[in-house]
Regions:
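Sec-dependent signal peptide recognition
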Residues: 2-10
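Conserved active-site beta-strand-loop modules that form the wall/rim of enzyme catalytic pockets
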Residues: 367-368, 377-378, 409-410, 439-440, ...
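C-terminal, non-catalytic macromolecule-binding modules
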Residues: 377-431
């Protein structure tokens, strides 16, 4: 099949020509090296080069002063070699392989397109990658002769349409003097509060250009850009419990971040909330009804559903494969749909961090309806086929130095039946009365979470709330509480979702897993859960500092 071709010129001719020369070197060396490797006793049937040109600018401020400014540009080469065939190759999962070959051993490249240096580094990296692939393939052949195969007949690599496309953007430029002034102003807001023991205002501007060629004929160059403005502050209660709060703003360009006056107002509200948390009572162990805000519900789905939908886990013999046999069966209430869509850049005007044009295997990002009317329909797939799914749907992602695996993008939860926030609270009270509870809980904000998917440990999750309120049945004002984590097991948690609100919250952040840290988003309406469990959060025995904090000069 002829490669699909598209070229979009977004840059000056000189800059474009320089980048084209990099692609030319990659293509030339790919063809030269592949011609040799396919004639070896253990032939390589696939070879790919990916270059990631990353420019990162980070500014940090504290107490009205600029703490650090750094700008770094690096180029990384990842070489992917496959020995064997599409049906069986060196990446075949082995029961005893703890990392399933996730490392890629990246090579740092010069920033300038020095053809001789590039060719030398490509040659060295290709030989190293081939030697490792050939060794792994020998282990695969030996292992198959003595072990039961769980995924017999499922190929190790999918055949995909080759594509040629150039859609590059110049690296983002930042007015560092302007943003240094802004960060100093924002961080100075914490100075009058000595009970805030640490704080930070951080701006990260990340601009990435990716170049990918492979022996199937794919030749791609595209850009990914994002900006995070992060606010963090921490205090400590009298009993020693550490109390952090965070506020993060995401945009595709720095000028698209919220106005500084809005950020200033948000910081003042965060400071007041920290003050209230220091005095808030500790919530005892609780099991009962709760509302998850849209942001909290997004993290909830990311942890307990999203990671279990990642396709390679359905083939990994060390994974619990909890959802593998539930395809076509209900796993959520019939009023909920769950979609993953890297092509959607905004939801209700809010930018989404998990957006991209192509994944790291050269497959276009695609909208995936994972759950439809509560029924499991699909998994997130890279080019590792699983039973019933022969092709990638554009979710093979990685950070440089690691092998691409199926990862999340923009997780979107949709509710077919919605009620107003007021009605959702009233339904919470009704559920509390039915269960004989004095109050229910509202999880307003969360820090993040983690989950376990291996067979050797309980398949549980832990979502770490930052802001939790008691909602009383008798109508008393909501009460702020602290000191708990939201825990549970996936299928039970799914079954307890009983209603959804009409609002939508968005969580943007970085997700870490086998293939590294990647930007993702999770968005959802608020959810009413008939029964959740919380456990006490780990607590330090340290008391608040004896010495008063030094006075900080006001910002000028």
């Amino acid at each position: 099949m002829e490669p699909r071709t598209r070229i979009l010129l977004l840059l000056g001719l000189g800059w474009y020509s320089a980048q084209a020369s990099l692609l030319e070197v990659l293509r030339t060396e790919l063809e030269r090296n592949a011609a040799v490797l396919k004639t070896q006793p253990q032939p390589a049937y696939f070879l790919a080069y990916q270059v990631t040109d990353l420019q990162n600018t980070v500014l940090e401020a504290q107490a009205g002063k600029l703490r650090s400014v750094s700008q770094q540009r690096t180029r990384w080469l990842d070489v992917d070699v496959r020995v064997g065939s599409y049906e069986l190759d060196n990446t075949h999962p082995l029961q005893e392989a703890s990392d399933w070959g996730f490392r890629s051993y990246p090579v740092r490249l010069p920033l300038r397109d020095d053809e001789r240096a590039l060719r030398q580094l490509l040659w060295q990296a290709t030989m190293s990658a081939y030697d490792e692939a050939a060794e792994s393939y020998a282990k695969v052949l030996a292992g198959r002769s003595v072990r039961v195969q769980e995924t017999e007949g499922v190929p190790d690599f999918s055949r995909e349409t080759a594509r040629r496309d150039i859609q590059l953007k110049a690296h983002l430029q930042l007015d560092t003097a302007l943003w240094a002034q802004r960060l100093r102003m924002l961080s100075a807001l914490f100075a009058p509060h000595p009970w805030i023991y640490s704080h930070r205002v951080r701006l990260q501007v990340s601009s990435t250009q990716k170049f990918l060629v492979n022996t199937e004929g794919t030749e791609l160059a595209w850009s990914e850009q994002f900006v995070f403005l992060s606010i963090s502050a921490q205090t400590r209660a009298d009993d020693g419990m550490e109390l952090p709060l965070y506020r993060t703003y995401f945009a595709f360009r720095a000028e698209e971040l919220p106005p500084m006056e809005q950020v200033r107002t948000d910081i003042l509200q965060l400071i007041e909330l920290l003050r209230q948390l220091r005095q808030a009572p500790v919530l005892e162990t609780y099991a009962g009804p709760a509302i998850l805000s849209g942001e909290a519900a997004g993290v909830f789905f990311h942890e307990i559903l999203g990671h279990r939908l990642e396709g390679h886990r359905q083939k990994d013999p060390n994974s619990a494969q909890m959802l593998r046999d539930l395809l076509g069966k209900p796993i959520l209430p019939p009023f909920l749909d769950v979609v993953f869509d890297p092509t959607q850049r905004f939801r209700d005007g809010v930018p989404l961090a998990g957006s991209y044009l192509y994944d790291d295997e050269g497959v276009p990002g695609q909208r995936v309806v994972a759950v439809e009317a509560g029924v499991l329909r699909n998994f997130l797939l890279n080019r590792t086929p699983i039973p019933g799914f022969a092709h990638s749907n554009g979710h093979g992602r990685r950070q440089p130095g690691l092998k691409p695996v199926a990862r999340q993008s923009n997780l979107l939860v949709f509710a077919r039946e919605r009620v107003s926030p007021e009605e959702l609270r009233e339904r919470l009270r009704q559920e509390c009365r039915r269960q004989g509870k004095e109050f229910g809980l509202l999880f307003a904000s969360v820090e993040g979470g983690f989950t376990f998917t291996a067979r050797t440990v309980p398949n549980a999750f832990n979502v770490m709330p930052l802001v939790v309120y008691k909602i009383y049945v008798d109508g008393r004002p909501d009460e702020l509480v602290r000191g708990v984590d939201f825990i549970g097991t996936p299928l039970t948690a799914f079954a307890n979702i009983v209603a959804a609100g009409s609002d939508v919250g968005v969580f943007n952040g970085l997700c870490g897993a086998e293939s590294g840290n990647i930007p993702v988003s999770a968005s959802s309406p608020s959810l009413l859960v008939s029964r959740i469990e919380v456990q006490k959060k780990a607590k330090s025995d340290e008391r608040p500092p004896i010495l008063p904090a030094p006075l900080v000069e006001p910002f000028r």
